[in-house]
C-alpha cells in the first residue's frame, strides 16, 4: 500500500511598495486555510486573508491556548510551502497547521496611513486545495476542490465592532486513496461537530479580531429527542376499549343465540301439537272414537234399535224362557199384532200349572179385562198359547207389597220402572193375584170403580234409550197422573165394550205394536208416544 502525495512548489508573487503590516479583519470569525492532498478539513472562517506583502495564518488544535502570529513576506513563502507539503496526518495536531474546531486569535498591525495593496498568491497542487469560509451567522461549510487556485487580496480598512453568538455545526469529510496492487481503494469518512461561536471585533485601525470556539464531540441531536415517548394509555382507556368490544360483539352474539334457541323451542312445540292432532284425527277415522265428544252424545251412525224397541240387558231381543221355580215370576211379552200386553192366563202369577179352562182365575181375568187375547180365549173356551220366546223375566228386586190397601193402590200412580207407562196401568206384579170368585169380583169392581187402567204392561217391556227429548217431555208434565187416568178410562171403555170381537178393531196403544193400523194411531197422545209409534 502506498500513499501518493503530489505536491508542487508554490509560487508566491508578492507585489508591495514596502514591508508593512497586514490588517486581517473578519466580520464573524477567523480564517483558516488547509491544503491537503488526501484530506478535507473544514474550518470556521468567514473571510479570506488579504495582505499586500504577506499572509498571516494562526491556528491552534484541540482547544490549544490562543496564539498570535505575524508573518512578513519572506516568511510567508516558507510557511505556505510547509503547508503544501504537509500530509493528511496534519489534521490531528500541529503547532502551526490545520484545525477543524479551535479557538484562535489573529492580530495584526497596519500602518497609520490606510494604504491598500493587492497581491496574488497562486497556490498550485496536483492534489486538491480547500478553502472553507463561513458566513457571518456562524454556520461553517466545507467544499472539496481539485487543482484550484485561491486568490487572496487585502485592503486596509477600518474594522467595525461586532458581537455575534450562534450555534455552528461543521461537517468533516476525509477521503483517502491508496493503491493495493492493481486496484485503487478510496475510503471516505464523515464526522459532524457542533460548536458555539461568539465572535467579537473591536473598533480601531489596528484591528484585532478574536473569537472563541468551543468544540464538543457529541453528534448533533435531532430536534425530537430519542428519549421522548408518547403518552401511554391509562387504565380508563383500556377499560373503555373492553366495554366497547363487549357492547359491539358479545351482546349481539348472545342475543342471536337466545333468539335461535327460542325459535327452535317454539318450532318443536308446534310440531308436537300438529302430531298429536293428526293422531287424534286418525283415531276418529279408524275407530270412530272422538275424545272431545261428550259421553251422552248419540252418534247418528249408531245402528237403529229393533222393531219392538227392546234391547235388554244382554243386548238380545230374545229373553230366557220363563221359570218361576227359583222365586222369580215370569213376565209376559206380547207377540206381534197382539192387542193386549198381558200374558196368557196359563202364565199368570200364582196360577202355577193353570190352564185356560180353569174356572176361577180365568173368570177373574176375563172379568177384569186383563188382556184382549186372554178374554177372547176365555169367552171362546179355546186354549191360548204363546211362543216360548215371548217371555221375559222380571228384574231382580224386592217383590211387590201384597198387603197394600186398595185406597193406597187407587191413589198412588203406577211405578213399574218403565218410561213407557203413559196411559197404562201398573204391572200385574204390583198387586197380588185374586184367588176365588170373591177376589175376582173385588178386583173387577176395583178396576171398574176406580177407573184405573186395565191394560198393564210388564216392568221389562222395554229399556228406554237415553233420549234427552223424551226425558224433557216427561219432565214437562205430559205423563202426569191425571192425564193417565183420563186416557186409561177411555182405553178401558173401548177395550171392555161388549161389541169387541177381536184385537183388530180395538185401539192399540201398546209400545210393542209393530204394525199399527191407521185408524188406531190417528191422534198420538204425546211426543214419546209418537216416537214409539215411529211417526217421526
From Swiss-Prot:
Compartment(s): Membrane
GO biological process: positive regulation of cell integrity MAPK cascade
GO CC annotations on file: plasma membrane
Biased composition (Polar residues): 290-326, 403-424, 480-509
Alphabetical keyword list: Membrane, Transmembrane, Transmembrane helix
Membrane topology term: Multi-pass membrane protein
Chain segments annotated as transmembrane: 247-267, 351-371
Composition bias, Low complexity: 7-76, 204-234, 327-350, 430-454, 517-527
Spans annotated as Disordered: 1-76, 204-237, 287-354, 373-536
UniProt protein name: Uncharacterized serine-rich protein C11G7.01
Source organism of the structure: Schizosaccharomyces pombe (strain 972 / ATCC 24843)
Amino acid at each position: 500500500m502506498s500513499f501518493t502525495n503530489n505536491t508542487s512548489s508554490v509560487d508566491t508573487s508578492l507585489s508591495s511598495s514596502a514591508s508593512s503590516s497586514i490588517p486581517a479583519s473578519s466580520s464573524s470569525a477567523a480564517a483558516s486555510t488547509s491544503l491537503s492532498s488526501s484530506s478535507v478539513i473544514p474550518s470556521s472562517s468567514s473571510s479570506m486573508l488579504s495582505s499586500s506583502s504577506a499572509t498571516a495564518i494562526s491556528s491552534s488544535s484541540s482547544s490549544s491556548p490562543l496564539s498570535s502570529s505575524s508573518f512578513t513576506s519572506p516568511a510567508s513563502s516558507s510557511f505556505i510551502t510547509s503547508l503544501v507539503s504537509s500530509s493528511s496526518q496534519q489534521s490531528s495536531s500541529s503547532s502551526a497547521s490545520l484545525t477543524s474546531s479551535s479557538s484562535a486569535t489573529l492580530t495584526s498591525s497596519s500602518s497609520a496611513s490606510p494604504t491598500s495593496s493587492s497581491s496574488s498568491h497562486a497556490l498550485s497542487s496536483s492534489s486538491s486545495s480547500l478553502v472553507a469560509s463561513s458566513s457571518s451567522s456562524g454556520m461553517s461549510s466545507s467544499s472539496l476542490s481539485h487543482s484550484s487556485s485561491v486568490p487572496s487580496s487585502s485592503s486596509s480598512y477600518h474594522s467595525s465592532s461586532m458581537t455575534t453568538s450562534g450555534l455552528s455545526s461543521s461537517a468533516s469529510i476525509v477521503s483517502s486513496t491508496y493503491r493495493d496492487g492493481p486496484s485503487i481503494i478510496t475510503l471516505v469518512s464523515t464526522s459532524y461537530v457542533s460548536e458555539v461561536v461568539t465572535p467579537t471585533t473591536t473598533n480601531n485601525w489596528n484591528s484585532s479580531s478574536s473569537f472563541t470556539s468551543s468544540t464538543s464531540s457529541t453528534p448533533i441531536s435531532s430536534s425530537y429527542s430519542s428519549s421522548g415517548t408518547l403518552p401511554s394509555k391509562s387504565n380508563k382507556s383500556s377499560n373503555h376499549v373492553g366495554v366497547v368490544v363487549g357492547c359491539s360483539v358479545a351482546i349481539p352474539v348472545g342475543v342471536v343465540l337466545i333468539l335461535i334457541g327460542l325459535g327452535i323451542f317454539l318450532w318443536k312445540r308446534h310440531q308436537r301439537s300438529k302430531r298429536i292432532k293428526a293422531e287424534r284425527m286418525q283415531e276418529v277415522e279408524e275407530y270412530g272414537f272422538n275424545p272431545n265428544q261428550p259421553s251422552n252424545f248419540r252418534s247418528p251412525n249408531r245402528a237403529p234399535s229393533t222393531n219392538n224397541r227392546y234391547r235388554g240387558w244382554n243386548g238380545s231381543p230374545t229373553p230366557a224362557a220363563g221359570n218361576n221355580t227359583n222365586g222369580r215370576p215370569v213376565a209376559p211379552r206380547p207377540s206381534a199384532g197382539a192387542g193386549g200386553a198381558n200374558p196368557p192366563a196359563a202364565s199368570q202369577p200364582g196360577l202355577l200349572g193353570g190352564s185356560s179352562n180353569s174356572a176361577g182365575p180365568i173368570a177373574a181375568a176375563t172379568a177384569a179385562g186383563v188382556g184382549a187375547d186372554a178374554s177372547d180365549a176365555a169367552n171362546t173356551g179355546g186354549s191360548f198359547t204363546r211362543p216360548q220366546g215371548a217371555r221375559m223375566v222380571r228384574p231382580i228386586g224386592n217383590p211387590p207389597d201384597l198387603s197394600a190397601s186398595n185406597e193406597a193402590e187407587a191413589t198412588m200412580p203406577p211405578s213399574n220402572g218403565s218410561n213407557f207407562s203413559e196411559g197404562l196401568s201398573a204391572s200385574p206384579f204390583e198387586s197380588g193375584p185374586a184367588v176365588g170368585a170373591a177376589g175376582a169380583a173385588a178386583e173387577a169392581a176395583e178396576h171398574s170403580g176406580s177407573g184405573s187402567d186395565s191394560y198393564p204392561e210388564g216392568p221389562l217391556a222395554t229399556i228406554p234409550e237415553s233420549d234427552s227429548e223424551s226425558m224433557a217431555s216427561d219432565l214437562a208434565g205430559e205423563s202426569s197422573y191425571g192425564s193417565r187416568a183420563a186416557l186409561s178410562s177411555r182405553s178401558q171403555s173401548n177395550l171392555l165394550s161388549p161389541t169387541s170381537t177381536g184385537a183388530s178393531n180395538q185401539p192399540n196403544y201398546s209400545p210393542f205394536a209393530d204394525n199399527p193400523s191407521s185408524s188406531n194411531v190417528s191422534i198420538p197422545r204425546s211426543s214419546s208416544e209418537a216416537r214409539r209409534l215411529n211417526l217421526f
